[in-house]
Amino acid sequence: MKAEEWLERAKKDLDDAKFNLEGGRFEVSAFLAHQAAEKALKALYVLKFGRLWKIHDLVQLAKQVGAPHEVVDVCDKLNPHYIATRYLVETVYTAERSREALELADKVIEWVEKQLQK
């Protein structure tokens, strides 16, 4: 897949995350927010390296594509949602927690979009 296709899928995942937040499916919403950020970063990775890196660690992806410290910090906050939403851990998902994940993912997508326009 091309970088643009990865970014388009990232945006769709973010839209789906918003839909699930509105429907009260907070865990699904936070998971999709993580997926949106991951796919956005993979768009940039594919553009830079010409191949896909099969990894779910947003911090590692962000560092590999040369993200600034602020974006790496955002990724660090999003990273736990990959595991916590899929396994029965003690994390309680609320509308506020899911909304925060959406906002963080949106920041990653915005940064990636700017990089792709350069």
Where in the sequence are the language-model features?
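Terminal alpha-helical segments
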Residues: 1-118
